[in-house]
Amino acid sequence: MKLGLDIGSTRIKCVVLDDENKLIYSTYERHYSRITEKIAEILALVRTRIDGVENALVALSGSAGMGVAESVGVDFIQEVYATRVAANTFIPGTDVIIELGGEDAKILFLTNGLEVRMNGTCAGGTGAFIDQMATLLNVKLEDMDELAKQHEKTYTIASRCGVFAKTDIQPLLNQGARKSDIAESIFNAVVSQTVAGLAQGREIEGQIVYLGGPLTFMSELRNCFDRTLGTKGICPENSLYYVACGAALCAEKTIDFDEVIEKVKNYRGSGNFAFNQPLFKNEEEYKEFCDRHAKADVKQKELKGYTGKAYIGMDAGSTTVKGVVLNDDGELLYSKYLPSKGNPVEIMKQFLDEVYEINPEINVVSSAVTGYGEDIVKNAFAVDYGIVETIAHFTAAKYFMPDVEFIIDIGGQDIKCFKIHNGAIDNIFLNEACSSGCGSFLQTFANALGYEIADFAKLGLFAKRPVDLGSRCTVFMNSSVKQAQKDGATIEDISAGLSLSVVKNALYKVIRASSPDELGKRVVVQGGTFLNDAVLRAFEQEMGVEVVRPNIAGLMGAYGAALYAKKKSKGVGKSTITDKKGLDEFVHEIKVANCGMCNNNCRLTINSFGKGRKFIAGNRCERPITKKAPANDMNMYAYKLNLIDSYKPVEGIRGKLGIPMALNMYELYPFWYRFFTELKFEVFHSPYSTRKLYQRGQQTIPSDTVCFPAKLVHGHIQTLIDMGAETIFYPCLSYNFDEHLGDNHYNCPVVAYYPEVIKNNMKDIRKVHFIKEYFGIHRPNDFPKKAYERLSFHFPDLTLNEVRNAAKLAYQEQENYRKKVIDKGNEIIAKAEKEGKKIFVLAGRPYHIDPEINHGIDRLISGFDVAIVSEDVVSPRAEHFRTHVLNQWTYHARLYAAAKYVTERKDMELVQLVSFGCGVDAITTDEVREILESKNKIYTQIKIDEITNLGAVKIRIRSLLAALEND
């Protein structure tokens, strides 16, 4: 008889095998991080259930099991080895194992030796990720599978971490997307994460076995894997227990059950962990703290029987919905704070129903709504005003502290911070796409440890040694918490430590403050997270100042919206908001349709509310609403795409030559097009990127850490092969053209050398002539000779004269292209000056004009009636200046020069586009920010990736415009 234990990140599995390796007992239980207690409990139970188990050979495996195994003297079997042993025993001939656990994901390639791919520090695409998403959708985890089977369409959702995914999903929910479609999209995201992130370019083929909880319980998830891989994998009986079975199969010695149970019970960590000072020394100090904060109080009056003027404010937030009713004096007549449960419209209706039920005769003079769900709620209930949430929170903060210098709002999954200068918002910080440091971050931890958030927060108030967890992402923090637990930290220490880490993350990761002093001394804190006294105390300790936390900290967005409605109406008139009769007749119907008005073919979610009111979501431009094509005459991004489209293929005797429309080719295509057309090739480029194109090359991406624009190259190359290209030209280019803006003119390493990655990771590239040699376009004098040497190897009939002539015309073509871009940019600027429009420099890289990379951000911004130019239009206008960093990259030198020029103009603002995974941008963003802020310009950064929902982008742009209005 053999017994195996698998101690995973979230659950413990225990099996007993008989002498013929048949499973005779199994158990599968969640341990809520109380690992030792649970092991003791399971071993005691097994002993009562199975006769003779005391003589069984015992071994232990699993990601959380090594420390326990060492301390109690049980053999530890590495889990990958255990899985392989079990697979070879029970399913001989297995080629690939895909295993998803609670927080870990693995692919085991068993053919031709063992090769293992595991997730490192990110739990994206694992069971914990699906768990989080189920919570967000407000459905039971076990219902996710059935829900996904009912899908009609899918959305693009990032699965690298739960936080990115929330950034995608929350706006979809707020816009009325069907939960079944989102559930299927979540499963597709998990597949995408596993295939692209773990396989890293190696093909998944042969006999595939699915293991682990998510793949065992969710048949639709297995179907998603099958569809993506073009195969039919098997999920064996007892797939949950393969690691435990493998451990049992490797067990070689018996144990003394009583002794092991006793040792496990008494297992304690070393007690060696870094810790901070306590939040409160004693109850008395805590009481003083509570009394001080009780002074920032909003007076409350009864709504029932109130006959004066009333103002309604609503905040449809990312995870919660808030509503308030105020009187003329700003006193609170009624308030509601509820989870949105993925349906802000229904919750807002509930709020209004309650208001009318308490006071059927209420005289609502004006109303306003803010937050992620602003647009849909405004349409649904005919609310008078919409207000961007940054301004709503600022309005509320001023009510409590008119001379406020700094406001920080920590909500469910977003952090908003504003610096105030001369009574106006001077600078805005929003968390890009990471919610460590937000309310949901704490909630996730509390739930994982088996606590309600309110109880969990209180635990940390008097902790003696709050763990120093640093300021890290949720998943990194998971490993830190586990390590601290192993080292003997108590739940109280961990609770206090997490509160401190939230604050540090907000201050040093989001705001990127070098010290708390630069934020000012007059601070208002708001957002539901600050109702947590531990977080508030940690913030005051870190800042070194006493701050103001209103007693309605969680309602400040709605309160600010109500104050805004009051100010706009001047206390006169009647609100258009749906009245009691209208609510009784209220309907909300959702249907899905394809737009079809342009190549994007956006999947639209159409919300109808009766009486002709509609809200359309999922559109990347206003065309489905206005029925007109967007005006592109003042949009440089649109102009550049049209310019590239003007280069049509010309038949050539040397065959079809394809160029991937990716990375630097968005700028260099005119050069190479003319060069090879003159050499008698039929030159064409791959289509602009789409989601489908990305997926065509996804399985060959060798690293998930590379930026999204680089990942797209694989899809472009595969598409060119499918389009019948005989030759694919994608050269390595260490240098770019010298524009005399910086100290040198390198391309970044990814742009320069990605062709090498393609050559070594795409099997199909061998089907065509692939030219990826190194070329030096920055040296016009010796380019023809070097190009001839490289190309004549592939095309021996080429002559040096042909290449010389083609090169001469190619340089002319590139110069013509640059002139057209500059001329068009100058035309846009001149027209904007004449019409008095704001000019936005949308600064990024050449490839940021790719519609799949920018997700229509240019069209969204131009919808605010501003002119858009790119950084290369204004960079030549700047005088040469010294930067604080080594200015050696062409694209980055443009950014710095553009930022410098923008500081010299009152009518220009710079918005920087940054792709996730761009290492060099860690430097450029700080430098661009410094250049702009040195002349009191607002720095706005938009991080883009596979995420397609522009809700957060819209908030950022509207906040910038609102700050400029108040300037």
Predicted ranges, named:
Residues 4-44, 115-116, 120, 314-353, ...:
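Short glycine-rich, Thr/Ser-proximal phosphate-binding strand/loop in the N-terminal lobe
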Residues 34-35, 112-153, 161, 239-243, ...:
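Glycine-rich phosphate-binding loop plus the immediately following alpha-helix
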Residues 64, 199-228, 239-243, 370-373, ...:
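Glycine-rich phosphate-binding loops at beta-strand->alpha-helix junctions
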Residues 76-80, 226-245, 384-390, 540-559, ...:
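Conserved phosphate-binding/catalytic loops in two-lobed NTP-binding clefts
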Residues 106, 253-309, 416, 567-632:
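Acidic, glycine/GT-rich loop-and beta-edge segments that sit at the periphery of enzyme/chaperone cores
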Residues 119, 123-130, 348, 434-442, ...:
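An N-terminal assembly and electron-transfer interface module characteristic of large anaerobic redox
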Residues 127-132, 237-270, 395, 439-444, ...:
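Glycine-rich phosphate-binding/hydrolytic loop that grips phosphoryl groups
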Residues 165-196, 479-508:
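Adenine-nucleotide phosphate-binding core of ATP-dependent small-molecule kinases
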